[in-house]
Amino acid sequence: FGSDHYVGRYMKMMFTASDYDDQICRVILNAQAYTGHHVFADSANNGPRMAALLQEWIPYLEETYNLGGSAEKRFLAGHSSGGWTAMWLQVNNPDEFGGAWVLAPDPLDFHYFQTVDLYAENANMYVDSEGAEVPLARMGLKPVLLYKDFVSMDDVLKDGGQIGSFEAVFSPKGEDGRPVQMFNRETGAVNPEVIAYWKKYDIRSIIEDNWEELSPKLSGKINIIAGVLDTFYLEPAVIALNNMFEEKDFDAMVRVIENGDHGSVFRTTVIREMDEYIANKLDLPNIQQKTKK
């Protein structure tokens, strides 16, 4: 969230540390819209973003730069909102991509929308069931930002803020032409009717409800890394999804890094690991050998 395609300039050093950098074409996408990060999901408010990517942009890119044009040569990767995007695109288009690397993703399970269970009776974004204020961010174990305070700032900024970005993707369009708010801004009370609409964007729910169809197509393609102390409390959804994978003996790589936070999971070693995964899938030769084997 908040970055665009120019971030590739600052990531170049991380990329060039890979043994396979000269054999991999990296495309940095810009998911920023007037409403915020559209996460390449088709939505009532942002329009057919996923459809445009799959039907227009990728074919154009592959034809223009002779990139092969086959699903097994396409891989997804992203961090934070970009991590959610990578998972969303892979799960909804399992035959179009060869694998996804998902780092510190936005909530993959809306039972764990950070620290709030959106499906719970009387769910509230500001206070929990015991009346304690709900935190949105922390440093280590210490909460440093409350949800209510963040929402107050987000609403002042209007379109393009994080909360509004979620609603622009997940919510229906209201009679006023704007995304329907998921919760009451004064009280924090969650609107269950809106959450019922949101469920079609709940990635864990999509996988579980379509398990027989999706599991063989996604096997070996899912790689998720999060920090056990994610700054924005995003790791519980990752842990819940991994628990489901383990119960079903599903082939996925999910790693929750001890002492890791939101930013520290995105590192050069992960880029190298991701590239080795791609190299193994495509049987690429290691002709650079920048790292010791």
Q: Where would I find each of the regions flagged by the language model?
A:
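Non-catalytic cap/lid and distal C-terminal segments of serine-dependent acyl enzymes
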Residues: 1-293
